[in-house]
Every structure is written in C-alpha cells, then in structure tokens.
Amino acid sequence: MTRLVIIDYGMGNIRSVYQALRHAAPEADVRVISDAAEVKQADRVVLPGQGAMPDCMQFLRDSGLMQAVLDAAASKPLLGVCVGEQMLCDASDESHSARPTPGLGLIPGHCLRFRPEDMRLDDGSRLKIPHMGWNNVAQRLPHALWDKIPDQSMFYFVHSYHVAPRNPAHAVGVSTYGKPGTLPFTCAIARDNIFATQFHPEKSATHGLQLYRNFVNWQP
C-alpha cells in the first residue's frame, strides 16, 4: 500500500487536502504528519501552503521539517499545492522586509505579484487581486499528472503571487488573469520527481481529484 504523507507545519488547508486525497485514492495510506521521521518512511509527499510565503517558510523552518522536505524531494514524488508550489522556488517578492523571501530552491525561479496595471480592463474597470475563483488551465507541456484531464480544464485559484520558473521546460501549465493581451502566468511546474500547482486540486471538483489520483499512481 502506498504511504502518502501531507506535511503539517501549521500553514495549509490540511483537512481539505486530506479528504480529497482519501476520496481520490482510497487504496492509499494517507496521513497528516508533523514528524520528520514519518516523512522518511513515506512513499510520496504533499506540501500544502496557505497564506503568506514568508510565514509559510518560517513555520516550515520552526517545525523542523524543512530538511525532511528537501531530503524527500531528492528521491520521492513530491506535490506542492498553492503556496507549497511557491515555496519550491528560489525566492518570492512577497516579503516582510525589503529583501525577497528565500524559498527551498528546488525549482529555479521567482515568485512575482500580479501587476495592478495589468488588471485595468478596456472599460475602465479593474480585476481584483487576489485572483480568486475558477479559471482554465492550458497544459503547456505533457505530463503524467495531466492524464485523463482535458486541456483547458477549469481549476480553482486563490492567490496574489505566481511562479515564474527560470527554465521554460519547468512550466507545464499556464493560465491567464488580467486585461486582454496580458501574458499567461505559470500555474503548474514540474521537474523530475516534483510537480506543483498554484491552483487548489482539492477545491477543483472532478479534475482536481483526478490530478491527485494521478499523483498517487505517478512513477517518475
């Protein structure tokens, strides 16, 4: 039986992620853990995140789980969700100081805030930041976690920052938010045994459950 752990470091939509994974993969042993030893025993790891990235990184450090996550990322399938995706990158402009917040450095890239000037529409109205609600996701590159999910499927977002990966080959999913002509933003990244999404699979109905199911069955 596959043992899958959800990292509980005090910041994340843990209960919803747990329930969605249990529903998507009832044959898996899904656990919420806060002990580094249990991460070592796991076959697969989910890193959720919710709120501000500086706080998430601080809580992860304080929990004593940061090294366990880095060790797991070296060899085990790892899924980052929402701020959990942002934490995988080098740094984020979201910060409590004038300096960017360092991330885990697992996928080269930087987290950027949506630009207010891109939110003004032709009729003078403005889209709100954070980007909140359902939006389509274009599968920019093929990946096992897109299996049985149609291209341009809708997923649920709640965020003000987005990942800009340094290597375009790591951007496997994109979406758009802003005035017509605004460049797409990356909403799913992948490298080797790591996959991460800005959107919330646990809030994304059938397609979100399928993505979780694909993660449980993924053999990178």
Regions found by a protein language model. Name each.
Residues 1-5:
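Extreme N-terminal starter segment of soluble prokaryotic enzymes
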Residues 15, 20-28:
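Short helix-loop-beta junction
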Residues 27-38:
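A short, well-structured beta->alpha microelement
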Residues 38-39, 72, 188:
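Structural alpha-helical scaffold elements that stabilize or flank donor/cofactor-binding regions
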Residues 42:
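An anion/phosphate-binding loop that grips the pyrophosphate of nucleotide cofactors and donors
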Residues 51-131:
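Cysteine-nucleophile active-site neighborhood
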Residues 109-220:
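Amide-donor transfer/coupling interface in amidating biosynthetic enzymes
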